[in-house]
Amino acid sequence: MKKISYVVVLISLTHYASASSEINFSPDSVSVDASLSVLNGKSSEFVYNDGDKLSQLDWKIQNTPIVKAGITWDAISWLTLNASGWTTLASAGALMDDYDWLEPEQHHWSEWSHHPATRLNFANQFDLNMTGWFLKDENYQLGAMLGYQETRFSWGATGGHYSYNNGNITGDFPRGQKVIGYQQKFSAPYLGLAGKYIYRDFDIIAQFKYSPWAEGKDTDQHYLRDITFKEKVINQKYYSAVINVGYNITPQARVFTEMSWSRTSNDIGDSTYYDNAEGEVEKMKDSAGMQNYNYTIGAGIQYRF
């Protein structure tokens, strides 16, 4: 009798594993979503010498409209694949402040320039991930995520005013004069957790992502001096959280509001200096740093075929 029970259990488990691993090609296994959001945040770049900070440039993002889109495939009962991204719709107003510490033993900056006519030229992101659901019920789901993400930002600062030599030299840059251009790119393979709770026609989706392997690259173009810095930082820490609250207006259509937050923390990396006029190149170890945080708030619609 015991042998028969074991055989029945084994057959049942084998059948469940086979069924649960069957690839789902039905149309209702695929959903698409689109939303409009507002992006805010700040990127910073740093210059170091023997561990001392010489320069910090803060590039702010202010209420920039973006469009988000994504496609999701419930490929297997326990596995979901997703591709998503967002991009700015057009260039937008931004802000840049440039601080330098040129006086030895002085903790407060000695040089500062302010550029209210800065523009965010573009920003975008793409994200590829998969979620394996280890808890799945009619009202809740919990899973582990594995993914890869890239995020890019580009700014240009023109005009503005300056205060040098501890305020002894002040003035204005000509209106419209190109001062500094800056591009930043972060890439990160990541791990994460995903969860979903369903109550009648409402649901809440939450995601948390983490990576200790983020990599930052940037290009800093100083137009007035005709010099360029290119920097690279590895093994940065990346954190991200998303909350999505939705309502199913039909079995196929869902409207939602969403808030996301992400941060890539500063770390020390290397820099390459280019004197474009003289053709000189110099590589500098442990001389650069960069970081970014940003958040979005928006609303959209999801459709399941």
Language model regions located:
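Outer-membrane beta-barrel biogenesis signature
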Residues: S18-A34, D201
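Extracellular/periplasm-exposed beta-strand and loop segments of Gram-negative cell-envelope proteins
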Residues: G41-T64, T87-F126, E150-F186, S211-V242, ...
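Post-signal peptide N-terminal segment of secreted/secretory-pathway proteins
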Residues: K68-T72, I76, T80-N82, T88
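Residues on the lipid-exposed face of transmembrane beta-strands in outer-membrane beta-barrel proteins
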Residues: A69-W73, F126-G132, L146-Y148, L191-Y197, ...
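Repeated loop/turn-to-beta-strand initiation elements of outer-membrane beta-barrel proteins
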Residues: S77-A83, D137-Y140, D201-I204, P251-T257
